[in-house]
Amino acid sequence: IFNKRKNLFALNIAKKSKQGRMILTEGYMDAISLHQYGFDCAVASLGTSLTEEHAAILAKYVPEVVLTYDGDEAGQNATRRAIPMLEKVGLRVKVLRMQGAKDPDEFLKKYGADRFSLLLDKSENQAEYQLESLKRKYDLTDDEQRVEFLQKAAQLISTFPSAVQREIYGARAAEAAGITAEAMKV
């Protein structure tokens, strides 16, 4: 019996790629478009959210996954849900942000493969993605919102597994809010 929870669209092609990573898309049309533009490492879950089974399958083939889900709220929620699932199976997770297009298919049609490749190379690690997503919710010129951002950022950063990550991203949050890194440690 065919089980969507255990299959990834285009895995048969992507697993042969020499890229050393897979690009995970929200829909199969995005994966098809990426393949047409030369990105042979793209896969998509088949009409279902990413599952633990999908994550385990990806981990068999590559050390890194780049999430390229849609930029809408549903896509960003799916990105946030996927990150811990992928990390749990030992994958490095990066997130690609697209400006000016809702998904990879639209981006490629508007801007082309070269520009997508540049974005791919600049994709954020999960810590950068989560901190930047949090920052975008606040007006950091307003003191009350700066305080709220810093409180939420501190909660987020405290979940990062290494002291080095906490130091780096604590300093970035402090810089974004215009305070010293020392004040962030208090």
Segments (PLM) and residue ranges:
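Phosphate-handling DNA/RNA-contact segment within nucleic-acid enzymes
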Residues: 1-61, 65, 78-79
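A charged alpha-helical hairpin associated with nucleic-acid processing machineries
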Residues: 15-22, 51-65, 69-186
